[in-house]
UniProtKB/Swiss-Prot annotation:
It holds the Pfam family DUF34_NIF3. The modification Phosphothreonine is found at residue 255. Signal peptide: none annotated. This is NIF3-like protein 1. It is found in: Cytoplasm; Nucleus. It comes from Bos taurus.
Length: 377
């Protein structure tokens, strides 16, 4: 009975503190907040298969005083968010992933949507955008390894092309073919930018034209050039690529400044993730005393990201049985910590980073009921 009263007092104290704390903060318009969140970590970094961004939006206008952070949005977590007067829930995992054909009270995910809309609470999910971000989940996971240098295993592409257009077209025009007239005609095509420079080929003065153009404009450019066989025969068409980003991407390949034993690395990981147990598969020929210099890691489910990466150790939340066997056969040890255990601890760092990024304009709180559904007993 006494313990129940203590828990009630503690819960009441937290709620009172939350209300006092939130009253000291101002509000942000939802659209302005979403723009700031995208500035913090662009949604363009997310994988193409993912469902990220604003998933549930109350009718506008909608202002946010309290941003509620959770790894998984369950019904228990939703109840907590409502009790704490959340205006927007940032759920790392998207609670809406597969399309919904109806919104009824039948399934728990449908009920989440209903309760959010009834209580004017938005739901936002960054998921793999935060996996890829330089200050994101995987970088946080790497902090537990010790002093190391790291790089993405699969670098992300920049969200934009460094120049206008998706293609470059180059061809030469002789001075007898009136370069100015050709340039003028090309500039009339929407989505084309033209540069030119002089060149001499086979003792003939020429103007080398270079165009950057969109995919749609490319068809019109080719149609124009094909009208003049001399142009068309000397044409080169290049497909432009978005550059890879140095510090952004999926997974991390971490090289320790100093090698440590596998046993030491296990203890570091358990300490960082606040876990008493992890699952270990020893690589063929390896022991707990084997040195670890290179660690490949991926928060959550890492099979597809880690596969084929040369390392002493794989660290992730979960992998399939056969992928573990495959890694072990190559002498790579594997540590599995359960899916969300490799992600949830990041939220504390995220709260501090968002407080600074948003200039302390709103109240940001962490879920106290969010937890991994699996327990070792």
């Amino acid at each position: 009975m006494l313990s129940s009263r203590v828990r009630l007092v503690a819960t009441t104290a937290r709620l009172v503190h939350s209300l006092i704390y939130s009253s000291s903060r101002s509000f942000m318009d939802l659209k302005a907040l979403l723009s700031s969140l995208n500035d913090f970590a662009s949604l363009s970094f997310a994988e193409s298969w993912d469902n990220v961004g604003l998933l549930v939006e109350p009718s506008p206008p909608h202002t946010v005083n309290t941003l509620f952070l959770t790894n998984d949005l369950t019904e228990e977590v939703m109840e907590e968010a409502l009790q704490k007067k959340a205006d927007l829930i940032l759920s790392y995992h998207p609670p809406i992933f597969r399309p919904m054909k109806r919104i009824t009270w039948k399934t728990w995910k449908e009920r989440l949507v209903i309760r959010a809309l009834e209580n004017r609470v938005g739901i936002y999910s960054p998921h793999t955008a935060y996996d890829a971000a330089p200050q994101g989940v995987n970088n946080w996971l790497a902090k537990g390894l010790g002093v190391c240098t790291s790089r993405p295993i699969h670098p992300s592409k920049a969200p934009d092309y460094p120049t206008e257009g998706t293609h470059r077209v180059e061809f030469s025009v002789t001075h007898t073919q009136d370069p100015d007239k050709v340039i003028s005609a090309l500039k009339e095509i929407a989505g084309v930018s033209v540069t030119s420079f002089s060149a001499r080929t086979d003792d003939e003065e020429q103007t080398r034209l270079s165009l950057n153009c969109t995919q749609q404009a490319l068809m019109q450019v080719v149609a124009f050039l094909s009208q003049n066989r001399q142009f068309y025969q000397k044409t080169e068409i290049l497909s432009l690529e978005k550059p890879l980003l140095l510090y952004t991407g999926m997974g991390r390949l971490c090289t320790l400044d100093e090698s440590v034993s596998l046993e030491t690395m296990i203890e570091r990981i358990k300490s960082h993730l606040k876990l008493s147990h992890v699952r270990l598969a020893l690589g063929i020929g390896k022991t707990l005393e084997s040195p670890v210099k290179v660690v490949a890691l991926c928060a959550g489910s890492g099979s597809s990201v880690l596969q084929g990466t040369d390392a002493d150790l794989y660290l992730t939340g979960e992998m399939s049985h056969h992928d573990v066997l495959d890694a072990a056969s190559q002498g790579i040890s594997v540590i599995l910590c359960e899916h969300s255990n490799t992600e949830r601890g990041f939220l504390s760092d995220l709260r501090d980073m968002l407080d600074a990024h948003l200039e302390n304009k709103i109240n940001i709180i962490l879920s106290e009921t969010d937890r991994d559904p699996l327990h070792v007993i």
